Amino acid sequence: MIAAHCLRCGVALVDRHDGERTRRTCPACGWVFYDNPLPVVAAIVEHEGAVILVRNHGWPEKMFALVTGFLERDETPEAGVLREVREELGLEGEVVSLIGVYDFTMRNELIVAFHVRATGTIVLGAELADHRRVAKEKLRPWPLGTGLAVRDWLARQT
């Protein structure tokens, strides 16, 4: 998200070069919009012997990915990933392990990925159009974003 106006005084921000980067800055009070990456949690969800991939509304018909979501204020990454699994799949989960932390610079996000074991009956949340069950041996990583977490998790399975 790019800020257009100062959060302190409401004046329109301007681009100002600070020697290293160009940043959105308030010409009236000097406030700087740093546009820091947003923390996102991601889950490789194991449920009844398969990995669950999901498809959001608006995504292409064959595009599936991991359960993901933005970390909330005052929430640990572990609590956030379990909340996302509950909200998106209706499942209760337990964090098995941290898989890794991945930059996703094209979306200005920092992904914190976990392996989660889940139980219960899948009930898709409002954000999701579909889900797919994939056997571990058939799961294939994709070259960016959460696909890197899939790659690293699969490497640890053998």
Give residue ranges: language-model regions:
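Structural detector for helix-capping/boundary residues
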Residues: 69, 83, 96, 134-137
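Conserved Nudix-box catalytic region and its N-terminal flanking loop in Nudix hydrolases
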Residues: 46-87
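Conserved beta-strand segments that form the floor/walls of ligand-binding pockets within enzyme
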Residues: 8, 25, 52-53, 65, ...
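A short coil-to-beta-strand element that immediately follows conserved catalytic motifs
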Residues: 16-17, 92-100
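NUDIX/MutT-family hydrolases
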Residues: 124-155
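Acidic, metal-coordinating catalytic segment for phosphate/diphosphate chemistry
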Residues: 1-42
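Active-site-adjacent beta-strand/loop module that shapes the phosphate/pyrophosphate-binding cleft
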Residues: 100-124, 132, 136
